[in-house]
Structure formats: C-alpha cells, structure tokens
Amino acid sequence: VRHTATYIPPVAARSFAYLGVTAHEALATGNPALQSLAGQLTDLKPLPARGSGDFDEPCVIHAALAAMVETLFSNTGPTGQRAMVKMSEIMGRTASAGIAEDVVNRSVAHGQAVAAHVLAWAAADGGAKIDNMGFPQEYT
C-alpha cells in the first residue's frame, strides 16, 4: 500500500475487504462448514463450484489472493511490483511443495476463477475506477 499511488485509506480499505471476501470464498467452496457470502453481500452471485478431483487448500487460496493482489495493486511502484512478484513466487512454491501437479493445476485454476468472480463483482461497486488521485472531485 505504501508504494501504491492513489491508495488513500478508503481505497486501501476497499482492497483489503475484497481480499478478505476472496479468501473466505476460496475456502468456502471446498468446506461445507463455511457458508458462502453470496446472497449475503449485495449483488454477490454464487461463486464457481469446484470440479471433480482433489484440491489443495493452500494452492487454492494462494492462487486466489495472488490474482487479487496483482489486480488490486497493479498501479504500485517498481518496489511494490518486485515485492509482489517475489512473494507470489515464494508462496506458490511453498504451497505446492509435495503436491501432485494435477492437484496443483486444478487448485490454481479454481483459485483464479474465484478471484475473477470477485473482481467482476467488485468492478460494479463504484470504487473500481480511481480518479483525482483517490480524492473526491469536490472537497469542502
């Protein structure tokens, strides 16, 4: 956030809220004890269901959050960009260590689908486009 232009507190809070929703939904699709937020949060439609086969939860959540961070913080400076890439590589490698390749691929694809769904939902909230460096056009 520190290196991301336009990230005043409301903009940062919005991004962190969407990261939380994404993390919850990524796990809720594979855990019947967790209730999806679809239908509870305004206009959030049911998320993509998991297909058949095994999934690895760390790989699912890593892929979902990595996709969200890449999009939500895309306008960060060079230092932030390098940090995001490095962290994603380390976390991806750690999450997938010892997991069968087909399970990793299926899990990553599902995590990315969850992120895409949440990002599409977020695009309609009125806060996706940041003008005037994140400050209101008219300020009194």
What is the predicted function of each stretch?
Residues 1-140:
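Acidic/polar surface patches and capping/hinge elements
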